[in-house]
Amino acid sequence: MNTLIDTFTVRKDELFTALVQHIQISFVSLFIAVLIALPLGIYLTRHKRLAEPIIQVAAIFQTIPSLALLGLLIPLVGIGIVPAIIALVIYALLPILRNTYTGIKEVDPALVEASRAMGMNKWKRLYKVQLPLAMPVIMAGIRTAMVLIIGTATLAALIGAGGLGDLILLGIDRNDNSLILLGAIPAALLAILFDFLLRFLEKASFKSTIITISAGILLTAAIIVVPYFASDKKEITIAGKLGAEPEILINMYKLVIEDETDLKVNVKPNMGKTSFVFNALKSGDIDIYPEFTGTVLETFLKENAKTHDPEEVYTQARDGLAKDFDMTYLKPMKYNNTYALAVSPEFAKENNLEKISDLGPVSDQVKAGFTLEFKDRSDGYKGIQDKYGLTFSNLKTMEPKLRYNAIKSGDINLLDAYSTDSELAQYKLKVLEDDQQLFPPYQGAPLMLTKTLDKYPELKKPLNKLAGKITDDEMRKMNYEVNVNGKSAYTVAKDYLKDQGIIK
């Protein structure tokens, strides 16, 4: 409890910002869903043949996994708040649509006939009789949708939309339960609060409900429109993948750019995995992010490294990006954050493990825990199978940070890692030598669209100040400061740049 209170004290400003973002996303999504589902539900009560097929389509949409839906939306609308809202609206449609249709359909036919006998036309019957009587059922659907939206909105953090999911993802990444709770508890309380408010609205008069919904529509429009008029034309956005290391790097980029130019830099840490961030760059939703040479070849260019020489691998990656994607890849830093296989110290000692080839005789004892990306890469597990002839029958896939918890608890004894991971030292893991030279060099460098550099040519000089800087050991220590000692990535980045004389 004390740790949670301490975390709250340190991060209360971040919590407030995330809470406001979460409410904005949830509020906008709910009202757009109501604007779509309520009229559609009314329409279906008058066209009953279409009702079941359309409601079934809404049900099918709700079964699409949220991560898959976000992944499909990114190439179409980019990253940020727009795809998050679209996804949340899709998930919220079913309960509102079904309850609107059911609520109106179950109004006592005798009352409808009585209103017809009094000379009311179909619109008056709807407004004066059917909707007021159906409103409790409709509001129950809206309440269900609201709770669903607030819970699912935590995933918006994966695509840079912000919200309480930022704190939850950061907690998972840092293995910090207090951070996870700092995001999860407000999300739960928010769901309870909104449910209470909507329950109160459910008991209000029909006229009051309509006025409230109308006010909500105007507020929604304001939330969507105002930020566009307030945007800063001289602002650039630098994003990073999940993890402490990308967050340190993007803060370095921010600091060197703002030190030498008049550009304002907005950073978006922990945006998501490789495909999310790269697609965001392609669509122009972000301007720069740090990418690694080996990832460029394997994931984007679908090429094997022609050599293991770092300079030649960088040149191959740089030229391929320029040709295939019209992107500029600036000079890389010194450290090589390549893949590695690491085992628990006990397993290494028991079996005298020094290099990857040593796993052959004990492969039946291996309990491997790999990331999904590593398992699917030709320079990952597929390469291990091809080049080393190793297949692990007991293999689980999991999120990057969960692997270290799993090896600590003994659930696994082998994992994939990056050579600069602070956890290698934290958990005293044994890194196995890549004796067959499977893993290519992975040097990080700023990646951007060529048109971005054409627009802001002043970016090149400050960013190239990081070229050839940061050794493996320095990066590992910086990661340790963030992941283990709890320092902010911004502070660690600033301290390094000042120590090196790169900024004043």
Swiss-Prot record:
Gene Ontology molecular-function annotations: amino acid binding; transmembrane transporter activity
Domain ABC transmembrane type-1 per the UniProt entry, residue ranges: 19-198
This protein's record includes keyword Transmembrane helix: yes
Reported phenotype of the disruption mutant: Deletion in strain LO28 significantly increases sensitivity to physiological concentrations of human bile, in vitro. Accumulation of abnormally high levels of bile salts, such as chenodeoxycholic acid (CDC), in the cytoplasm, when strain LO28 is cultured in the presence of bile. Attenuates systemic infection following oral inoculation of BALB/c strain mice with bacterial strain LO28. No obvious growth defect in strain LO28 in culture when exposed to osmotic or chill stress.
Keywords: Membrane, Stress response, Transmembrane, Transmembrane helix, Transport, Virulence
A GO BP entry: glycine betaine transport
A GO CC annotation given for this chain: ATP-binding cassette (ABC) transporter complex
Record note on quaternary structure: The complex is probably composed of at least an ATP-binding protein (EgtUA) and a transmembrane protein (EgtUBC).
Domain notes: The transmembrane domain (TMD) and the solute-binding domain (SBD) are fused. SBD binds to ergothioneine.
Family: In the N-terminal section; belongs to the binding-protein-dependent transport system permease family.
Name this polypeptide is given: Probable ergothioneine transporter EgtUBC
Organism of origin: Listeria monocytogenes serovar 1/2a (strain ATCC BAA-679 / EGD-e)
Lineage: Bacteria, Bacillati, Bacillota, Bacilli, Bacillales
